[in-house]
Amino acid sequence: MSRSDTGSQGADASPVAVITPPPAQTAHAGQPERRMRVLGALAGVVGPVLLAVYFTVPALAHWPYAGTSPDKLIAYATAHRLLFYGGGWLQATGSLLSIVFFLVLLQLSGARSTLAGSVALTGCALLLSVVVIEAALLEAVPIAAANGDQATVATAFALSNGVFARIFPLAPAPMVFAGIGFALSGTGVLPRVFARTAVLICGLFLIAGLAAVFATAGLILAIVMSVVEAVWIAAAAIALARTTAHTRHLGGESR
């Protein structure tokens, strides 16, 4: 028998070493996903809260109506400068956090590379673009008021009030909720009711956007749907947090 045969026989006779990862390593394997779930749920709760503050505070501060004279707008913007700047921040930040929540849902569902994921991503980009433009117009009002520029004050204020409510349901909102709804279908990321209601919200936004073209009632419906959207995001975020906590509890019991 040659030396190579002896070596191979010894190798075959030796037991096979099985490397088992320590429990700590196994426990940390799902940490990135759990962390993403927690951060996503947090963003999904804080975002709608900021948007609720953005929509509520102006009503309590006697916000000017459409058609207010430039002189009155300048006086109001000068006295409530922080309200305009804070409103722009609340709107942009609240929308950004809501979009972060949508992106987390897409990541968890594994649908980013699908058609539904692409539709949702495009809708998120459109939504953030519209929001940032409106926030910029809103913050331009006190800046122009400080310079005594009546034309810019009147134009910026008019564009930042009511225009967003008409544009939002035309494309951004339906694309976001249609994409998210179909992306969540057949997954266990959230309970099935959220996928179904997301598609329903998409349809209602389309109806509101079309109705707003012909009557004020459509604009009112679009505003109501914006509230429904915020409620859906907050409820979905809470559901995500609960499923994350439940999964972590089961993982702890298995260890």
Model segments located where?
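Hydrophobic, aromatic-enriched alpha-helical segments typical of multi-pass transmembrane helices
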Residues: 2-255
